[in-house]
Amino acid sequence: MQLNIAKIYISRLLLFLIIINLSACESVIRGKEYILPGERENILIGSANIKLAKSFDTIQLSEPLVTNRWISSDRETTNNKNNIAFSEEFIKKWSVNIGQGSSKLNLSSVSPIYIGDALFVVDTENTISSVNPDNGAINWSKSLFPEGEDPKIGFGGGLFANSGIIFFTNGFGELYALDPYNGDILWRDMVSSPVRAAPIADNSMVFVLSVDNKINAFDIQSGSKKWEYSWFSDTAGLVQTSNMALFEDKIIVPYKSGEIFVFKKNNGNRLWADSVNRKNIKNSLSQIKDITASPVIHGNLLLTVGFQGRLIANNVNNGFRVWELPISSSITPVASNNYLFIVSNDNILFAIDAESGDVLWTHDINSNYEFKNDNKIISMQILQNKLYLFLSSGDLIVHDPKTGKLTDILKNKIEGSTIPPIIVNKNLYVISNDGELISYR
């Protein structure tokens, strides 16, 4: 009898040790986990459980900004679009075909950029064009993909402009540095895997994040590699991906694993890390951990949201977790003055105090608008003190950012698109699904 009891105790002890080892497995694979300071509360899953602030001062936005450039898909290296000046007339000025449009298997994904006196756009077959923003005339076009490859296969990537150079990445893992005036290739390099996100650059280096969670840093003039950093690669993810950000001497990198890393941009030393993944999901294996909305820098705050994770705010300098909310989103949020606006994956619109994380108001978009077929929100912008939601159908939903009240629904106001529009010099530019670049004022 005593022998049987001893066997039972030994079996239970072995089971306990196995569980402990399994729980530590992720730390073994990924390396040491850095637990950042800051409050962490157990929260329920779903934005419906969020409580509103009891009272708040009237929301005041910053003055509308007249933009004269748009160097990345999210305007600047901070990924914050702010409150942008626009005529709000949405009158079509011109339209020009830029190449192959979207198909069911190959959606347009590269956002246009605007620098100097030209727009730069890419079609679904990796043809980049320079376009005159006044009349839509094509200045030059160039196909950029490896010889012998099908250009439709290398989807994704993006554009970025800095230091008089246009940088372009594609799904073949190529990085090009181009002369903006004639499209001449200044230099070209390759990374180890396909690239779905746009590159980002300062005055000395350009950075590329590939789908295998590896970041590469290249000299902006010569193309020589300066450093690289590899991280755990999560195979479960989405085609859509977010952009990196730059802040002072730091580069902010969102990974497909749901983690956000901050590096010293000159040498790749990791400064701190955090995660948007929720710890209380019953089956974490079913969670898509991607960060598809770009991280936004607003003041000293880094604001990051996961596709099925949460919205977190960190001090960008030291990683201190300031606050978090159970909000998931694939749309890059917008900050203006001291306020953050975000739309969740279940189409709930939020206004948040950026410093405290207090939710000031919410609005359920589904209560006023029926999403049919594949129609979805592709972008959120604050234009001329109004909160615009751009839909893939070309519809626009307009809210008052001070109260969240719906003010207008504009049906088929612009051409349907899968790419967020850009706004420069009070003109709005859209790449339509059929490969047309259209200018609205």
Describe these PLM feature segments.
Residues 26-29:
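Bacterial signal peptide processing site
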Residues 64, 93-113, 141-160, 186-203, ...:
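Extracytoplasmic beta-rich repeat domains
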Residues 116, 123-124, 163, 170-171, ...:
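Structural signature of WD-repeat beta-propellers
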